[in-house]
Design a protein with these regions (language model features):
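Sec-dependent signal peptide recognition
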Residues: 2-9
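Glycoside hydrolase catalytic-domain context in secreted enzymes
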Residues: 19-270
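Hydrophobic h-region of N-terminal signal peptides that target proteins for export
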Residues: 10-19
């Protein structure tokens, strides 16, 4: 009888060991992050990797399957719905990603948040150009703390903000999204902005790296001419300060060219 019990116990332990070995490392929350990332990347197909670079929106809680079709995309950005609708929709999308895709990779929910979360019913704050006029980074930090609270209620975990572009081309139609024309001021405002969001669990994505706000003729996304000195002393300065002192979770590249080189496609800039 004792031998039988020991045999059964050994078999149970063997099953447990096999189960533990079969569980993907990337799903083990106790494993080192580097190991989890490496394990997941090794399992992903090229199509799945490209999918992580894409954003897919549905707006229809009853047609999530039709929108995603069993595939894994990187981000979701749902707009023009109420806070409750957003929360419900994001929850359903997360459930779909976990249960109906091959690897169960969660989706990153995002929204614009330059002067309030871009969603129906959210608090609207003054535009960034007015924020910069306060010269008060602590006040900006308090503002983004409030924004983060509203974002989390809706299930939004990242904002596509702040804008660290320098307003040196006043014909550009997005000047109001900047903190102003001075790199130091922009840096101080950007640091306060990012800290307020991220200490409350919402990641920031400063943009547009780099020099996007000085397009030729003021046309959005037109090429920028400036040279190496302006690049480093003006345009890169706010990004260097904010990245070093506030540690944002991501950075958005610009969609223009600097001195004839498309920034996003350049290993030098990236």
């Amino acid at each position: 009888m004792r031998i039988i019990k020991l045999t059964v116990l050994a078999l149970c332990l063997g099953v447990s060991v096999v189960w533990a070995d079969d569980r993907p490392i990337y799903k083990d929350k106790n494993a080192p992050i580097e190991d989890r990332v490496e394990d997941l990347l090794r399992r992903m197909t090229l199509r799945e990797k490209v999918g992580q670079l894409q954003q897919r929106c549905t707006w229809d809680i009853n047609n999530i399957g039709g929108t995603y079709n069993g595939e894994s995309f990187g981000t979701a950005h749902e707009m023009n719905i109420s806070a409750q609708q957003a929360a419900d929709l994001y929850q359903k999308i997360h459930e779909y990603k976990a249960n109906e895709t091959r690897l169960g990779i969660p989706i990153l929910t995002s929204a614009e948040g330059i002067h309030g979360i871009l969603q129906n019913g959210c608090t609207i704050f003054p535009q960034a150009i007015a924020q910069g006029s306060t010269w008060n980074p602590d006040l900006i930090c308090q503002m983004t703390e409030a924004e983060a609270a509203e974002a989390r209620v809706m299930g939004i975990r990242q904002v596509l903000s702040p804008v660290l572009d320098i307003a040196r081309e006043l014909r550009w139609g997005r000047v109001e999204e900047t903190f102003g024309e001075d790199p130091y001021l922009i840096s101080e405002m950007g640091i306060g902005f990012v800290r307020g969001f991220q200490k409350n669990g919402v990641g920031c994505m400063p943009k547009h790296f780099v020099a996007h706000g000085t397009p030729t003729g003021g046309l959005n996304s037109a090429f920028v001419a400036g040279g190496e000195r302006e690049l480093r002393n003006l345009y890169m300065y706010p990004f260097a300060r904010v990245i070093k002192e506030a540690d944002p979770v991501a950075v958005m590249s610009c969609y223009s060219a600097y001195d004839g080189i498309p920034v996003t496609g350049s290993s030098y800039f990236m």
